Amino acid sequence: RPEQVLAPIYGSAWRYRHRARLSVREVAKKGTVLVGFHEKRSSFIADMKSCEILPKRVSDLLVPLRELINSLSLRKKLPQIELAVTDEALALVLRVLEKLTADDEAKLRQFQKDYGVDFWYQPKGPDSIYPMDPENATRLKLHHRETGVEVVFRPTDFTQVNHRLNEVMVTRALRLLHLEPSSKVIDFFCGLGNFTLPLATRSAKVLGIEGSTELVDRARAGAKDNNLADKTEFEARNLFDWTLDDWDAVWNKLGGVDRVLIDPPREGAMALCRSLADTDKRPARLVYVSCNPATLARDAALLVREGGWKLLSAGVMNMFPHTAHVESIAVFEPGPKPEKIDEIDEIEIGGMTEEAEQETRSEEPKI
């Protein structure tokens, strides 16, 4: 258990979801196209005309968008629309299985003009997206007002769906790390730099490590855009096969590490936590942000029981109202490492060794 339970963080229960994936299906019996979420535990698409968890701008667009899709010749070849909205822009990514006709494209351009949106096309996988109007597409940005950082992202990039609570979460993580101007920090699973760039405004050096080479390249570009290139470095590494040697290498590269932030996907960070449990080169503070309480509990147990880390505090953030999901945050600092017993010669827990039992039998009287 943590020594302190942090106060939970709540945001608005409504209008919070800034990313969503809408399914599209023509329903002949209704003579129309449905655009919306799937019904609970069903392949059916809800007949949505509004949505209270989407920003009002997006909710108000559902009916006009549905009418637009219904008017397109390729409506049967457009199974999905992914959306991303910020204060500045609304991007709609159309999963198109066929090339658009000139008439369809003209309708999209008129809709884009009338409603102030940016259409993107996705002919294949998520990396294949491109804007319909590259010269005029508005850039999507996450803002961290306390540090002045802006993180630019593409509509299919992973970002937190709740932008306001993401900003609060980043601020809380910075404060829990107890950063100093001389701090050397590693941000594991750094993505586009959601934590890395704000961390760099309060530290001497931040190393962001991420599995995707493309995200690392764009995180570097983000650091340059925010005038933080001289305080940041980025590496593309597979963090699921991280070893103690890898930890030693980054420790030596930075000349020591004062703080660590871990923000893994649902799978957690077992290999990374194993190295932090085994090493004698330990940072002064570790903050672990998690979207999966089960893997956080597993990794925390590894750090505490095998590495001697102390769980100072932990808390939750209601990042996803009206769902069963929760975002958690935990703070650790080094404690005394447990003693390791390599070999027990005479007595084992729960009974005697085989050698001791044999000696006892040899001393029993013969009858």
Predicted feature residues:
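Short small-residue beta-strand/loop micro-motif enriched in glycine and branched aliphatics
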Residues: S43-K49, L90-V93, F153
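Short, solvent-exposed loop/turn elements at beta->coil junctions and helix N-caps
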Residues: V5-A13, Q80-L83, K124-I129, G315-F320
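Carbohydrate-binding surface patches
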Residues: A84-L97
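Short beta-strand micro-motifs enriched in acidic
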Residues: S23-V27, A84-T86, E333-G335
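Extended interfacial segments that mediate partner engagement and assembly in macromolecular machines
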Residues: R1-L78
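Feature of Fe-S/electron-transfer and energy-metabolism proteins
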Residues: G11-R17, I81-D87, I186, L192
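Broad gene-expression machinery/nucleic-acid interaction feature
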Residues: R15-R21, T32-L34, L78-Q80, A89-A91, ...
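Rossmann-like S-adenosyl-L-methionine
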Residues: K99-I367
